[in-house]
Amino acid sequence: MTASDDRTTATAAPLFDVREFARTARGSHRSELDLSDLAKAPLPADAARLIRILRDLERSTMQRMRNLLVTATHKDARVTAFLTTWAFERFWIADALDYVLETAGEPLENPDTGRPRKLLSERAERRGPIRRAIAAGFAGSQLVAAHVTAGLVDEWVVSAAYRRLSSATASLRPVVDLVLSVKARHIRFLSEEAERRLTASPRAQRLTRRELTRSPWPIGALESPAEDRSFFESFVFGSPEGRAEAGRIAGLVAALPGIGAGVGSTLNARLVP
């Protein structure tokens, strides 16, 4: 490892104002949402199922935070400050999705659809916090770049699912527009941090390539039933338009500093059923 490999910041100063983000955090959305159209026609079963899956993904924040904060990421004040508000906003996105289900008269929980997938490529992501902390100790501070980049890619994947939901059910467009407006700031921060940190360090690039090729997509789906993950992939990325969206995300991944087309292709293959 060289000194340049161990840098934690790029030369460019960050532009995203984390304090302003915290000051203007968006909480409950129930009073903002006009769901009157939901009373006129029932939600399609596939739309209701995807809403429940997305709600569970938004709720998975605490498990993800636990995994991140046993690594060097917890020492990065800028990232941890962002994560605090990010978790708060995701909690209220999940609450808004519950409100949609309640208004539509839909069950809040999906039926038990079986066991999670057990993929060899995802085995490292199933480590407990102790093993994760030990492994992260060897990776050092450059692992922060891998975490923010994986978070960015995850936001791209989940945002694609929301857009698919909007295209499938017109009555949900106001909900999706609101959610995507909240997520736009998450994406802006993560994109800026990924670009800065990857540009600064070849070692960060190597760690990030490894992280992206072994992560489940979306990240919070690791313990989801296999049938729910298959449904998500098929409904969001199984159509010609969905495959084009997966290809677009793969292109964005490939264009990140030091990541390349190989990782983009691997991601595309994981998304498309």
Task: Enumerate the language-model features and the residues they cover.
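Non-heme di-metal
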Residues: T2-P273
